[in-house]
Amino acid sequence: MTAKKIYFASDFHLGAPNYKDSISREKKIVEWLSEIQVDASELYLVGDVFDFWFEWKHAVPKGYVRILGKLAEMCDQGIPIHFFTGNHDLWTFGYLEKEIGLKIHREPVEVNLQNKLFYIGHGDGLGIGDAKYKVPKKVFTNKTCQWLFSRLHPNFSFGLAN
């Protein structure tokens, strides 16, 4: 019997730079997920799976049905999937947890995996310096700013994000 494996991936940036390239990349990612599904004990998605993701109360971004379906299937199969928010997909407010089954992490975590200690996180804004990014990140993660942004129509919001 072969040991189960733990997989890590990040920075798919689905949705960019255009529909054709994104859908092609999404299909390849889903193919890879199907391959690892047979021996995965856990999957860590370490940020920027989507180039832009924002959940409204009654709407989520259109598209991504292939990857979302595959991730839901893997969760239903009992494979824990850890989704670390990145600087492009940090606006998750329950959909990915409730409907897909992902475990959302908004901050880096220390975790012991197979008797080895790992520090896992997307990495954006963690180092000293990088003030040009840390200030906007405070705005992006501010609850009031998120609430205000959620009042914008998704068509306008996506245009603004791009």
Please tell me what each predicted stretch does.
Residues N18, N87, N112-N115, N142, ...:
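Detector for Asparagine
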Residues G123-N162:
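Active-site-proximal loop/helix segment associated with metal-binding centers of metalloenzymes
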Residues E31-W32, G69, K116, K143-T144, ...:
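Short, intrinsically disordered/low-complexity patches at protein termini
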Residues T2-K5, A9, L14-L113:
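Core catalytic region of metal-dependent phosphoesterases/phosphodiesterases
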Residues L90-G94, I120-G121, G127-D130:
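Short, well-ordered, mixed-charge alpha-helical segments that flank or form enzyme active sites
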Residues F8, L117-G121:
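Short hydrophobic-aromatic micro-motifs
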